[in-house]
Amino acid sequence: MAEPGEQLPEEVLALIFRHLPLPDRAAAARVCRAWAAAATCSAVWHDTSISCDCELEGMLPPYLSACLDHVQNLWLEFEPSRKSSRRAATDLLTALTGRTPGLRGLCLECRGEKPLFDAGRDVLDAVHALCGAASALRHLDLRRLPFSLDDALVLQVAHGCPELRSLFLDNRTLVGSVGPGSVLELLEACPCLRALGLHLASLSRTALEALAAPERAPFELLALRCACPEDARAPPLPDEAWAALSLRHPGLQVELELEPVLPAESVTRVLQPAVPVATLRLSLSGDTVGPVRFAARHYAATLRALEVRAAASAELDAALEELAARCARLREVHCFCVVRPSVLHAFRARCPRLRSYTLKVTREPHPWRPTLVA
C-alpha cells in the first residue's frame, strides 16, 4: 500500500507545507519519506515565519539548520524578557549569518516588554553581523525592535546591503541615535532604495535633496516618526525641499506619526504644505484641532488615512467635518474619542472611497474595533 504522501505530488505537498507553522512542518517531515522530502524542499522555506517560544527548542540542529539555505524572507518573533526566546532568536540570526546567499527580506518583531535599561546589544550585534554578510538583502524591517538603533548599524546596512529596497528604522524607542550623516551615506550606497522609515531627527535637507537627484530610482514611501526629544529639537525641513522631492517622485507617499513629545511649535515645523502626506497619525499632548485643519487644507490631494487620539471637543468635531468635506480620497479614518453623529455622517457621505473607520458616537468598552465599509 502506498504511503499517504505518495498519493500527492511533491509540488502539491510543498504548497500545503509552506503555510504550516514550524512545529507542524517538523511533524510533517516525520510522517513518511515523501512528506520529509516535500517539507524540506526549497519552495516551502522561501517565506518563513518563526516564533521563538517553543518552536526552536531542539529544532535548529538538524531540521531547521538544514533548511536555512532556502530561506529568502524571514519574519522572526521573540520575547526580549525571556532568556530562552531571546537566545533562540540570536542563535538563529547567527546561524543565518554564515548562510545568507539567498536572504532577501528580514523582519524582526518583539512581543511583550523588554527589561528595564536593556540596550539589546546581543540582538543588535547579531543583526549587525547578519547585515554584513547578507549582500543580497533587499528588505529590512526593524520597526518592532524596542532598542535604540545607531549609526554603526545603519552604516553596516549601507555598505553590506547595496541591493536594499526598503529599510524601516522608525521604531518606538525614546532615544534617537541615528544621525543624518549616516542616513545620507545610506542613500548614496543604496541607489535602489525606494522605501525608508526614520525618526524625524535622522532626516535632513541634504537627504531630501539626495532623494530628489535626477539619477535616483523612483522613491515611493517615506515614513517619519516624531516621538523622542531629538525629534522635537530637529531643525525644520524647508517646504521647497519637499516640493522638489514631490516633483521628482510624483508617486511618493509620506507617513507622519506625531507623538505627545512634540510641542506645538515643533508640530508647526513638521507639517509643511508641500509634504505629500498619505497617512497622518496624531497623538499629541497639545492642540490637535489645528493639525487636523491643516491636513484638511493642504493634504486633500494625498491624504488616504487619518488616525487621531485626542480628547473629544466640539472644535475637533468641526475640524473632522471640514477634513471629510475636503479629503474625498480618504480610505481610512480612526478617531479614538467620541464624536458627534454629524462627523460619522460627513465621512460616510463625503468620502466615497472610505473602506474602514473608527468613529464612535457613544462610549463603548475598549478595544474599539474599526467598521469595514462594504
From Swiss-Prot:
Q: Which residues form the F-box domain?
A: 2-48
Q: Does the keyword rRNA-binding apply?
A: no
Q: Which InterPro entries match?
A: F-box-like_dom_sf, F-box_dom, LRR_dom_sf
Q: Which SMART domains match?
A: FBOX
Q: Does the keyword Cell membrane apply?
A: no
Name any one Pfam family assigned in the record. Answer: F-box-like
Function field: Substrate-recognition component of the SCF (SKP1-CUL1-F-box protein)-type E3 ubiquitin ligase complex.
Subunit details: Directly interacts with SKP1 and CUL1.
Listed name of the protein: F-box/LRR-repeat protein 8
* Source organism: Bos taurus (Bovine)
